[in-house]
Amino acid sequence: MNLNESYLDAEIPKGQLKHSKSGNFEGIPIVATTSEPTTSVNLDETFFKKAPIAMPICDDHSVSKSTSVNSLNTTSLASRRSPLQTKKLQAKNNLLSADLAKSNDDTTRALNSPKKDFGPYLDSENDIRSRLAESIYSMETSIRGSELQRRPYVSNEIPNVFKFSKFNSNCKLNESQTLCDKNFFIFTSAGKPIYCMHGKDEQIMSYTGLVNTVISYFQVNGPSELKTISTLTSGKRLTFLDKSPILLMAQSERGESSNELLNQLDFLYSYILSSLSERQLLRLFSKRENFDLRNYLESTDFENLDEICSLICNRMFPDLLLNSLQCLPFNHSSRLKLQNVVLQQLEKRQDIPRGTLLYGLIIAPQNKLCCVLRPRGHTLHTTDLHLLFCLISHQFQNLDETQELWVPICFPKFNSSGFLYCYIKFLPNDTHSNEKSALVLISAQKDAFFSLKSFSDELIIKLEEEKLLKKINTSKGFKLSDIPAPMVHHFIYKSKQNVQYVMPHFEVNSNIALDSSQGLEYELKLKTYYQQLHGTVVRDNGNLLSRSMLNFVRWSSKDNEDLAMDETQMDFSELDEYIIGNSSFKQESVNMVGMAWVTPTFELYLIGNNGIVDKRVLFKSARKVANWCQKHESRLFISDGAVF
């Protein structure tokens, strides 16, 4: 792939960086900031051993500013210590200084040795290259046996530079809306509340009257409808979507564009239509303008709205941002075999007239599209598929493989005035996993249940005979370590032709589960990085700035102060252990660089490891990612599907 490197800006001034020899690591420089003693590759003593600097503690027990120990007001603490405690602390400090000095001598002796000795960590430069090529992951021999296991040699967490992320993680559904940095409101043109993500009816009644007044004013006096109100000081943005007799409003302090918020509101409105249909909705309000729609909706509708809002706000959900589907990476020959089996089974069924089956889908766990059965020249809109996936994962996931559903669903982008009927059945799974794949057959005929059920039963038996069902359940996609692209923390690759995207597995630390609060916080951080990256290549109306562009975004923190500790909550023995055990304890500095690369055929959004600030290094890894995705395009994406 020939690339025009004129995209790249000028190199970062040399005074800010320190490069390794140009011949090492296939021309990739190791970047190290001059203000920090560790390399910014964050290899955690895997490649280079950091020598802590011994800093003596002053006589007045105050810590020197140049040391990496937390800046504590130890003068006031010393006044409260007894002479015995002070003497014990001085003895420990003397031992610490001696140990650190010895460590410095050992490290200096190793670095000045004429031999290329990399210590007990690596034996040669080849080891460095091979492990660096695996990004932040390496192979390690298991202690219990010879089986190789992948584990992160370093923490692959990314720093949090967004203040609202931690703030919003404590904001639960139906909590007071004043405590949250993002909220959704749905109400009628007459001011009747329908739904609010945070807050109760009493709390939002004041909003409805104000919003109706403002919207009505612009409808009468303005040249166009009101879409957004932004505040310059607080950064709060109010975005409106008028779908009379339904009005929707999003309140956000996250820096999202108007187009992003409008797409999210449209998705919520599409869900309401999927449950009612536009024709039925208009008929209800034509009889009475102040009709209370809450009395017509089911309790499951509000539960689904809660889940969708939580997915949009707090989870990594690039589907709406990129307006595309996530596809299950699957072996190309196995995918072709799967599509042929589906077509052959459909051709055998003479009792299913042409036009009875409109679409067929096999949806893998985590809402990843695996197979599509469709008529030639027709496809479903991504919004309709997103709604279907959300219903399956949130409302129907508790069903087992012996149960089946026949559900009327309105696909608003396909036909907002009518319903299609979906036969939904979860596929057998022998992998002892709670996540299940689903088979969905869509028809326009409400009496086609038994014919589609018979087709489904025969298809599942055939999939089990061909061992395709097991492959679907065990296919887990790919990891970042499968791609020879160093310095990359995470990426999203979108194929424009297929309107699909792929991304590697979330590989958080082994002691953090993705469904835990720390895992959710990680998803929210990653989501916000991508949101800001995407915002650099699109206009406020959602259109791309150009068909080809390359943008870099840098997040940095100039305030790299040492972590503070509350001295009122720490006794003297804890302070002694803290100083001895944390002589190099310092808050991680934020120095992140992300890249948004748009071409006529693909979009690539990539986040580098913290500390990698050389844009040419990151772009070289991005080219490897793009080449790898294009090389494995038949495995990563569904090009046509099973067409009949």
Curated annotation (Swiss-Prot):
It is found in: Endosome, Multivesicular body membrane; Prevacuolar compartment membrane; Vacuole membrane. Phosphorylated by YCK3; this modification inhibits the YPT7 guanine nucleotide-exchange activity of the MON1-CCZ1 complex, possibly by preventing recruitment by RAB5 homologs. Transmembrane segments: none annotated. One of its GO terms (biological process) is protein targeting to vacuole. The YPT7 guanine nucleotide-exchange factor (GEF) activity of the MON1-CCZ1 complex is autoinhibited by the N-terminal disordered region of MON1. Inhibited by phosphorylation by YCK3. GO terms for molecular function: guanyl nucleotide exchange factor inhibitor activity; phosphatidylinositol-3-phosphate binding; phosphatidylinositol-5-phosphate binding; phosphatidylserine binding. InterPro entries: FUZ/MON1/HPS1_longin_1, FUZ/MON1/HPS1_longin_2, FUZ/MON1/HPS1_longin_3, Mon1. Signal peptide: none annotated. The modification Phosphoserine is found at S22, S71. Residues 64-79 have a biased composition (Low complexity). Keywords: Autophagy, Endosome, Membrane, Phosphoprotein, Protein transport, Transport, Vacuole. In complex with CCZ1, is required for multiple vacuole delivery pathways including the cytoplasm to vacuole transport (Cvt), autophagy, pexophagy and endocytosis. The MON1-CCZ1 complex acts at the fusion of vesicles with the vacuole, through its regulation of the SNARE complex during the coordinated priming and docking stages of fusion, and particularly at the stage of tethering/docking. The disordered N-terminal is involved in autoinhibition of the MON1-CCZ1 complex guanyl-nucleotide exchange factor activity. Component of the MON1-CCZ1 guanyl-nucleotide exchange factor complex made up of MON1 and CCZ1. Interacts with YPT10; this interaction has a strong preference for the GTP-associated form of YPT10. This is Vacuolar fusion protein MON1.
